Amino acid sequence: MTAIRYEFIKTCKQTGARLGRVHTPHGSFDTPTFMPVGTLATVKTMSPEELKAMDSGIILSNTYHLWLRPGHEIVREAGGLHKFMNWDRAILTDSGGFQVFSLSDFRRIEEEGVHFRNHLNGDKLFLSPEKAMEIQNALGSDIMMAFDECPPFPATFEYMKKSVERTSRWAERCLKAHERPQDQGLFGIVQGGEFEELRRQSAKDLVSMDFPGYAIGGLSVGEPKDIMNRVLEFTTPLLPDDKPRYLMGVGSPDSLIDGAIRGVDMFDCVLPTRIARNGTCMTSEGRLVVKNAKFARDFGPLDPNCDCYTCKNYSRAYIRHLMKCDETFGIRLTSYHNLHFLLNLMEQVRQAIREDRLGDFREEFFEQYGFNKPNAKNF
């Protein structure tokens, strides 16, 4: 019996998107879903109760950051991440690989792992597949990720080929080092950049190892959206139908819908809380920057079509005032709204799949949001 089980419910006849449910040791969640990111064992400014109120069934935490602060041994002593942060629903932890490759100025990759510098104090550190498993086993997440190499975009075919081969060898080492397969599901990560041949090789290698789920990595790293969609189109069919598929680091509304249409079940991104901190809000009518002067006397909600706590209780003028005065409550209100917006969007996506009309929903949403305009603004 594995810790993670995927239950397939139906396919959208119009698009091929999947409706499903993922079962974990800490409850189940419906898919496609968006996972709020709690990098340091907290979704910035949000309480667990607030996340539950917006119906979040799973959140993400970060292995690299929790290894550095407070240290995985302290989290283990606390009884694991769920107890430490008072969250009784599912948690996914990433492997730390992305942070090693994106945050550290110095890094040296070798077969054993990666030498790099701590981005906080410059200390030399070493992270290997075995260490990534040790940390995640101590954290006790429901879903943990294999340690992979995260090449930048663009990368040459030759470099990417070596990287994919190394990632496959590291994935095998992760499986061997994983000490808690009965209560923690380990996902493999398909790499290969924009190269179909390498994505095929990576998927073939990882599927042969029979992971309980699969992530599609190396996207949302600077490539244009049409390349991301093309890669998804040839990658998701390579993955088993009876396992969850997770697209890492994607959180803009258009990409969530386009990813679901291409067979993705799970998404995560810091985007909704990061942009909330500078007053940028996702609304049913497009991007809204609440700090703008034109909202100083606007006493309507951030989004007239939203029923979240923020929109039911506070005006654009009030939230603008809080943001201009650097009041933390303003960030809480915009963060709550953006997270609610994406979680609610995914519920709308699931409903559209149930009704076999996700293609129509995409057209309506893109038209209303303004994604169809030639100068459409993203986040």
UniProtKB/Swiss-Prot annotation:
Q: Which gene encodes it?
A: tgt
GO annotation (BP), single: tRNA wobble guanine modification
- InterPro entries per UniProt: ArchSynthase1/Queuine_TRR (IPR050076), TGT (IPR004803), TGT-like_sf (IPR036511), tRNA_ribo_trans-like (IPR002616)
Q: Which cofactor does it need?
A: Zn(2+)
Any one GO CC term of this protein is:
cytosol
- Where does this protein act, in terms of pathway? tRNA modification; tRNA-queuosine biosynthesis
SUPFAM superfamilies attached here?
tRNA-guanine transglycosylase (SSF51713)
Naturally occurring in which organism (per UniProt):
Bacillus mycoides (strain KBAB4) (Bacillus weihenstephanensis)
Quaternary structure and partners: Homodimer. Within each dimer, one monomer is responsible for RNA recognition and catalysis, while the other monomer binds to the replacement base PreQ1.
Alphabetized PANTHER family for the sequence = QUEUINE TRNA-RIBOSYLTRANSFERASE
What family is reported?
Belongs to the queuine tRNA-ribosyltransferase family.
Which parts of the sequence bind substrate? D94, S95, G96, G97, F98, D148, Q191, G218
Please name the catalytic residues of this protein: D94 (proton acceptor), D268 (nucleophile)
* Region called RNA binding, residue ranges: 249-255, 273-277
Q: Which UniProt keywords apply?
A: Glycosyltransferase, Metal-binding, Queuosine biosynthesis, Transferase, tRNA processing, Zinc
Has keyword Signal?
A: no
In its UniProt record, a GO molecular function of this protein is:
tRNA-guanosine(34) queuine transglycosylase activity
Does the entry feature the keyword Zinc, yes or no? Answer: yes
Catalysed reaction equations from the record: 7-aminomethyl-7-carbaguanine + guanosine(34) in tRNA = 7-aminomethyl-7-carbaguanosine(34) in tRNA + guanine
Q: What does this protein do?
A: Catalyzes the base-exchange of a guanine (G) residue with the queuine precursor 7-aminomethyl-7-deazaguanine (PreQ1) at position 34 (anticodon wobble position) in tRNAs with GU(N) anticodons (tRNA-Asp, -Asn, -His and -Tyr). Catalysis occurs through a double-displacement mechanism. The nucleophile active site attacks the C1' of nucleotide 34 to detach the guanine base from the RNA, forming a covalent enzyme-RNA intermediate. The proton acceptor active site deprotonates the incoming PreQ1, allowing a nucleophilic attack on the C1' of the ribose to form the product.
How is the cofactor bound here? Answer: Binds 1 zinc ion per subunit.
Protein name as it appears in the record:
Queuine tRNA-ribosyltransferase
The residues that the entry says bind Zn(2+) are C306, C308, C311, H337
Q: What is its EC number?
A: 2.4.2.29
